Amino acid sequence: MDENRNEVGGGQLIAGYLGIILMLIGGIILLPIMLLAVYPEESVYASCFTIPGVTAILTGYVMSLFIRGRDKRRLIGHQDALIVVFSWLLAILFCSVPFMLTGKYNFTQSVFECTSGWSTTGLSVVNVEDCPKIFLLFRSVMLFFGGVGLVLVMISVLSDRHGMRLYCAEGHTDRLVPNLVKSARMIIVIYTGYIISGTLLYIYFGMNWFDALNHSIAALSTGGFSTKAESIGYYGSFGIEAVTIVLMLLGSTNFLAHLYLIRGGGKNFFRYCEVKFQLILCALAAPVLSAFLIYGGLEGHVGQGFRDGLFQVVTALTTTGFQTVPSFAVWSSPLIMVMTLLMLIGGGTGSTAGGIKQIRVCIMLKSLCWIIRSKISQKRLIHADGIYRISGYEYLKAEERLEASDFILLYLGVFAAGTFILCACGFGIGDSMFEFASALGTVGLSVGITGYDASPVVLWTETVGMLAGRLEIYVIFVAAVQFGREIKDGYKKTEGR
């Protein structure tokens, strides 16, 4: 009997894990207060962070008591998905409180801004030119932790036997080393190292330290939040744009690929199908976009046209959302179409980027080629085809092809639904497709639909799209079903008493 009492499972186990994550969220909310040492004049905003931060820590501590010092039962069903989704919802809700406490933003706008931050999207309702620095840093802090993932950060601190299930449920696919905790810590070390390097390079090319830090985090997390209304275009610097392109490409590349590259496995890195596919897409799309910009009269100088064309292709494909052009509202339909396609494809698996993911598109295109080849072949051949992963050449199973095609179909279905809602709000089909592709792909580029004055319907549609895109849709559906089961089981237990 004593052993059973010391075991915890079901709702208490879920609540306990959420408590640990909520304490982590509280700590994250308090981080921007450190900036007051440099900008003491913004201490008036300190309470905006201390109130929700301390509340989250205390609430999380109470919830964590459910599992403290007790043996944890195995997670059953899809409780892992439920924990991940609720973790992200708690992060968004608690982080929205500082914005609401300023009195400038309502609940919808605050939740939208924080969903954009945690999902590393970059769409915004904030006027960055009139925003206190402590809130600009807070947005970047959300990008940092949203990029690596809440669960991954928790695992790096705690060693837990359920960690792998939670790690996978959040969308991470690869372990850098056999030990999961070491994998999580290694990802954070690589991630932080790139950010520090990017910050120093930005300072070298003329940014002040505050802008450099924020833009480095935003570029590597493929988040796109900027401290300037004109984004990267404000600086008009080739060096800054080059650093940004490198950081965006690094952020959209699988972290396992980074490890191989750092350890000297350059051969495998450049053979990796996602790296090759990304470089090929950039090489094909950049000249097309540049040509339309130049001949469409949107760029007065050929060199600037190619510069902007390459930058916008990379920012769309990596789902970052920085821009060097004044506005997308004046772009022609072919330009909008190219950008929309790139945003739908997105970045690599196991990276900070969103979208369908390049590996799935690679598998779909390869499958299509194999089908065509088998159709035109005069002999009936059985092909055992595969693709280059970072570890080497691997044959593809039928289940992998089916999973890729199923996800693409589901993704496009959600994309169509979101586009329809924006169209119903009175926007054109092209603009609606662009805007929702940006939200669902966690990109952050906008044709002007999203902003402080956007309607609640638009903001909530994009909020759902951003969260679904960051958690790869399936997890949301699975968590919803599991939540229903938990309520049903709890009701049955209550009836049994």
Predicted feature residues:
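Membrane-proximal intracellular helices of multi-pass ion channels
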Residues: M1-R497
